[in-house]
Amino acid sequence: MENSQLCKLFIGGLNVQTSESGLRGHFEAFGTLTDCVVVVNPQTKRSRCFGFVTYSNVEEADAAMAASPHAVDGNTVELKRAVSREDSARPGAHAKVKKLFVGGLKGDVAEGDLIEHFSQFGAVEKAEIIADKQSGKKRGFGFVYFQSHDAADKAAVVKFHPIQGHRVEVKKAVPKEDIHAGGGGARAARGGRGGGRGRGGGGGGGGRDQNGLAKGGGGGGGGYNSYGGYGGYGAYGGGGGGGGSYGGSDYGNGFGGFGSYSQHQSSYGPMKSGGGGGGGGSWGGRSNSGPYRGGYGGGYGGGSF
């Protein structure tokens, strides 16, 4: 399960006075930090009231998550797994869910196989594989239900998983109303603590990919200028982009566009040695050891701020 992206945590709601040394001083109690940054306005150098820490291994990041809630300089802060730059604009990438969509399932995969695989990320309540109501034929996708949000976040960060020798794709199962179907825009954000009030911006366009999966367009403007509210993180600002949910209709009614998923299973193919990694890589050109400074802007809304 070792994946560098799982070692990276987002910290929101920081005190405007919290420095990088102060942030490091708090979180290094749970392990060795390979990177620590408080995001600031490049012109004013004023804190944007959020930041990131990267641990040397997943176990240390897990320990920090397990110790939540954290209070830093008098503020109770929010911890989440950091979403990679390339995935940050995907609709629902920052959603707080316990349910994941799993696509590209082969016919020999059983619900028990899903439970066994995904239990490495945290306790699984149940798994279901969707079948055609008339024929009973499996439709090539299903859902996994976790007991905690962090377990779902961890599994979603990896993105591609090996199940029965084949690569499957994992996405957060975000309800239609939460993803602003049809490319609806992000809601206006509220200002950060001590950091000024952001303006609500326009929403991005939505769409669908060839599998009928929700495909986001541009992210909503949101607060914190072009950051889209921490790039779509929780209630700190605008959501992360538009897009139709499950192909544009409620998945309870034929699972929307997911019904066509089985037609494209072959695109996943057998797992190859070393395959299946996801969510890693550099943020804006920096190496994994220092993924934020100078590179995070593109993944969290970009633009000037």
From Swiss-Prot:
Q: Which InterPro entries match?
A: hnRNPA0_RRM1, Nucleotide-bd_a/b_plait_sf, RBD_domain_sf, RRM_dom
Q: Where is the composition biased (Gly residues)?
A: 181-211, 272-284, 292-305
Q: Which residues carry this modification: Asymmetric dimethylarginine?
A: 293
* Modified positions (Omega-N-methylarginine) in chain numbering: 139, 286, 293
Q: Name one GO biological process term.
A: response to lipopolysaccharide
The location annotated for the cross-link Glycyl lysine isopeptide (Lys-Gly) (interchain with G-Cter in SUMO2) is: 80, 96, 98-99, 106, 154, 159, 172, 176
Q: Major location, coarse class?
A: nucleus
List of residues that carry Dimethylated arginine: 293
CDD domains in the record, alphabetically?
Answer: RRM1_hnRNPA0 (cd12326)
- Keyword Ubl conjugation set for record: yes
The chain's disulfide connectivity reads none
Compartments reported by the entry:
Nucleus
Annotated Gene Ontology cellular components are:
nucleoplasm; ribonucleoprotein complex; synapse
User: Region labeled Disordered — which residues?
Assistant: 178-211, 265-305
N6-acetyllysine sites (modified residues)? 133
Q: What does this protein do?
A: mRNA-binding component of ribonucleosomes. Specifically binds AU-rich element (ARE)-containing mRNAs. Involved in post-transcriptional regulation of cytokines mRNAs.
Q: What is this protein called?
A: Heterogeneous nuclear ribonucleoprotein A0
